[in-house]
Structure formats: C-alpha cells, structure tokens
C-alpha cells in the first residue's frame, strides 16, 4: 500500500465534493437554512434511556465490501428501524465510497420522529451547517481525520447549533484526544479507517478508560445479538449497526432482536 491511506483518499474526495456544493449554495446561505430548520432533537436523552441503544444505519455500500444493499426507499427503511425500536437513525451521506447522499438524509428526517445522525467525513464547518440545514440532530467527527485544533473547533460548532457529535476513535491516543476536545459521546470503531482492518477487541481496550459520564458507542462488528451482548459486557451504552441490518432481509425484525437483547434483564449494564 502507498503512504496514502484509505482515509486520506476518502477525505480528498470529500473536500472536492464539499467545494462543489459550496459553489452552488454559499456558506452564508447554508447557515440561513440551518437557522430555519426545526430545532434538533435531544440525542443524549435518547442514548441514556435504559438498556443498550441501537443506532441503525442506512448504508448502501462501504469501501471494504462494496455494494451492500439496493435501498430503493431510505424512508421506508428508516421507518422499519424506528418501528423495531432503534434509538437513532444513522444516514451515510458520503457519495463516492458509500453511495450516500443528502437526499437520503432528507428522506429519513421526514420519515421518522427519532434523532438522525449524519454519518460522513466532516472536515469543514460548511458540512456542520449543512447537516443542520438538512435536519440532522447528530453528526460524526472522526478523530483520525482531524488535527486537534480542527477537531475542537468542529465539535464546538456542532454543539453551538444544538447538535450532538459522535466523536469516533480507534486507538487509546485518539480517545485521549476526543476527551481533551470535550466529547460527550465517543464511538469506538473496531475498523481501522486507514487500513479497513477490523479488530473487535479495540472496544474492550479503550472503553474502560473512558469516564463514566461519557456515552460509549461500539461501532462495526455487530452481526447479531451475541456481538451486542459482548460489547455491552465491555461497557457499551449503544451499538451502531449498518451492514448487519441492511443485509438481513428483515430490517425491522433484525433491529427488534437487538433491542430486545439490549433491554433484557440479563444484558450487562454500563457502569454509571
């Protein structure tokens, strides 16, 4: 592999796409649209409900697996997730590698009454106002993609608009950076975005070092209830699930199975 990582390549494309969108809709205009949007929902309250929360993802493709599912109606899928008991709906909006779009975000926001997460590679303030303009209540900030001053600035801007940031980490050093930035929700991704390799032990190594007031989200590697319970035992407050749901054949039931497991009396409870 060359010195450029998969993450570097994705971000290069994202920067070009953001510049193209900003050439059509200016930063000032997107800020006005964000101000006009309905106020964001309370993500923290949703994630602090009893049991292990399920963040269910509308995900068409990924760099590691290619096309995953032909999602003709993202609104219908999101409604199925909500009916199954999901706490939050995650929507991929990155186009080049994940085949997502802001149109998907719009469709999902209009279809559900629970919080919606914009999952993308956020590298510029424009994208934060854009997320709010399209109805997002939460967005993803990837520590590996941002230097510390930019991470802190983007997190502050996200929260200034009333949204919640899911701050994603893959190493102990990145977790320290997330905490230094003031993250209140930290996602531990088992997948290394620089190589796309998956190591499900990453969560159990990082989560114990996070303060009890931080919401801990396990990302990647959830294929069924056994994985959810394993993450719960390691201290997860919530799991983010995409591929396992969109390829399940029955997304509503797949979410419901996870929700049932996560709220069962035998499910390990996060230490608080």
Curated annotation (Swiss-Prot):
Q: List the disulfide bonds.
A: none
What pathway does the annotation place this protein in? Amino-acid biosynthesis; L-tryptophan biosynthesis; L-tryptophan from chorismate: step 4/5
Quote the EC number: 4.1.1.48
Keyword check for Lyase: yes
Please list the GO terms describing molecular function. Answer: indole-3-glycerol-phosphate synthase activity; phosphoribosylanthranilate isomerase activity
Superkingdom per UniProt: Bacteria
Q: Which reaction does it catalyse?
A: 1-(2-carboxyphenylamino)-1-deoxy-D-ribulose 5-phosphate + H(+) = (1S,2R)-1-C-(indol-3-yl)glycerol 3-phosphate + CO2 + H2O
One Pfam family from the record:
IGPS
Give the record's GO biological process terms: L-tryptophan biosynthetic process
Question: Is the keyword Amino-acid biosynthesis in the record?
Answer: yes
> Mind telling me which InterPro entries this protein's record contains?
Aldolase_TIM, Indole-3-glycerol_P_synth, Indole-3-glycerol_P_synth_dom, Indole-3-GlycerolPSynthase_CS, RibuloseP-bd_barrel
Which controlled-vocabulary keywords does the entry list?
Amino-acid biosynthesis, Aromatic amino acid biosynthesis, Decarboxylase, Lyase, Tryptophan biosynthesis
PANTHER family attached here?
INDOLE-3-GLYCEROL-PHOSPHATE SYNTHASE, TRYPTOPHAN BIOSYNTHESIS PROTEIN
The text of the family note is: Belongs to the TrpC family.
Question: What's the protein called, per UniProt?
Answer: Indole-3-glycerol phosphate synthase
Q: Please report the organism this UniProt entry assigns to the protein.
A: Mycolicibacterium smegmatis (strain ATCC 700084 / mc(2)155)
Encoding gene, per UniProt annotation: trpC
């Amino acid at each position: 592999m060359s010195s450029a990582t998969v993450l570097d390549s994705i971000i290069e494309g994202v920067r070009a796409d953001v510049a193209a969108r900003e050439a059509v809709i200016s930063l000032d205009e997107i800020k006005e649209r964000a101000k006009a949007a309905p106020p964001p929902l309370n993500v923290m309250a949703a994630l602090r409900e009893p049991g292990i929360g399920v963040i269910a993802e509308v995900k068409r493709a990924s760099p590691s697996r290619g096309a995953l599912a032909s999602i003709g109606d993202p609104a219908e899928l999101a409604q199925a997730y909500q009916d199954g008991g999901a706490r939050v709906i995650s929507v991929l909006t990155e186009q080049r590698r994940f085949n997502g779009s802001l149109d998907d975000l719009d469709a999902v926001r209009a279809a559900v009454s629970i919080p919606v997460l914009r999952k993308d590679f956020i590298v510029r303030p424009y994208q934060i106002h854009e997320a709010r303009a399209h109805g997002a209540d939460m967005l993803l900030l990837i520590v590996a993609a941002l230097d510390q001053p930019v991470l802190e600035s983007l997190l502050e801007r996200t929260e200034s608009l009333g949204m919640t940031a899911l701050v994603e980490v893959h190493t102990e050093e990145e977790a320290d950076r997330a905490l230094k930035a003031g993250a209140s929700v930290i996602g531990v991704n088992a997948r290394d975005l620089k190589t796309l390799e998956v190591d499900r032990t990453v969560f159990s190594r990082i989560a114990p070092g996070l303060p009890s007031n931080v919401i801990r989200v396990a990302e990647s590697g959830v294929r069924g209830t056994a994985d959810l319970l394993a993450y719960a035992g390691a201290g997860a407050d919530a799991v983010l699930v995409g591929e396992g749901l969109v390829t399940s054949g029955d997304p509503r039931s797949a979410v419901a199975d996870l929700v049932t497991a996560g709220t069962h009396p035998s499910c390990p409870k996060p230490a608080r």
